[in-house]
Amino acid sequence: MERLNAEKAASLAIAVYVIIAFVFPFSAFAADFAHRLNSEKRSEKEGLGRNEVPLFKRIPGPGKEAVANKLIGLFKNSKTPITTQGTSKKQVKGNRLSIIGEDWFLDVNGDGTNVRYRNYKYLDSKPELAKSVSERLSNEKLEELGRVFIKQTLSEYIKIGANEELIPFYTEHAIGGGGQAKEGAPADEEKVYASTIVFTRSIDKVNIIGAGSKVAIMFNNKGTPVGFDYDWPQYRPTGKSQKVLPVEAIKNRAKKLASLDIDSPDVKVKRFDCGLYDAGVRKHDPKSVVQAGCAIHSYEKKIIDHDAYKRDKNSGHSVGAYTDFIPAGETVEEDGKWPQAMKMHGKNPVSRFAAPKDGPKLK
């Protein structure tokens, strides 16, 4: 049940879930799990698939300093590529705390529920591990490896609450090669350099959309973890619920709030997925609740040079891609950092399409 496409990771992301680019200056193959495909099919026909949803609050984490110190201690004696050995220095920029080692770095954001780790030197030093695209790690293998790493290493941070599920969402494979070393030479073989699996969460069978409740693990071709990202809070019920619009009403609302004119023949909607919207800690309004929403991923193709485009369909045009998160409740709860929700309350956000990335940053 995987869908394979060879698009740039950045176009999948958001322009996010977006959604996602690697450290590598390469293209990426992306493969969706059945859950994502089925969720999009259900969303297209039924929206959230229910008339009412409970509202939740993100529980604040222990703080970025506390989480950074614990992770440094966790990996200081590691014999794997995920290590915090050696000298390091701290940098603070806004709500981000960065610990920078000789070969690695660790970013902890906001209240400590958003973390990113990379060991780029290890990846750069192992070109011999590259494999042909056909030999890439399968979705099933990446899910297995990812679950083991989360259970054995990140279980203190990736907690699964009552009525919650950790769900495999999609994978991406960083691809290099495919070009010519010189004009007239045969194209180099495309090879996989690393693979990433992204998990999401559901509560009572309702998906979390947005950057919150995402965890991504990057592996080399031997199945060794070399990096991870997560934005993973705990939630508490508010005791309140929200009535949800039917799908056609959500789509009509999207026509008014989306960044692109989705009725235009030049605009294509790539994805439509509904659930509970959590923007992630970096775009989170502490006063807001996690409420019903739908993610709409759309792109617009504009012909700039008609002559060039006529000669070659791969040139002479530009493509703009966006991910908008559309409130799906009959009554929309206030959220000072959700542009579309602000507009529903008659407020003008700084950017109409300042949508957070739908998943951890992987570049």
Predicted regions and their residues:
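Bacterial N-terminal signal peptides that target proteins for export
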Residues: E2-V16
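Bacterial N-terminal signal peptides
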Residues: A13-P25
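Preferential activation on post-signal-peptide N-terminal prodomains/segments
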Residues: F29-T196, I203-D204, D229-K255, D305, ...
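Broad, structure-driven detector of short, well-ordered beta-strand segments within folded domains
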Residues: W104-G110, V215-F219, F272
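Conserved histidines in hydrophobic membrane contexts and catalytic metal-binding motifs
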Residues: G146, I217, A295-H297, K301
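Extended amphipathic alpha-helical interaction segments
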Residues: I197-F199, V206-V215, F219-Y230, Y235
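Charged, low-complexity helical/coil segments in non-catalytic cytosolic or luminal regions
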Residues: W232-H297
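Accessory, solvent-exposed terminal regions and/or long lumenal/extracellular loops of proteins
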Residues: L276-Q291, E300-Y309, W338, V350, ...
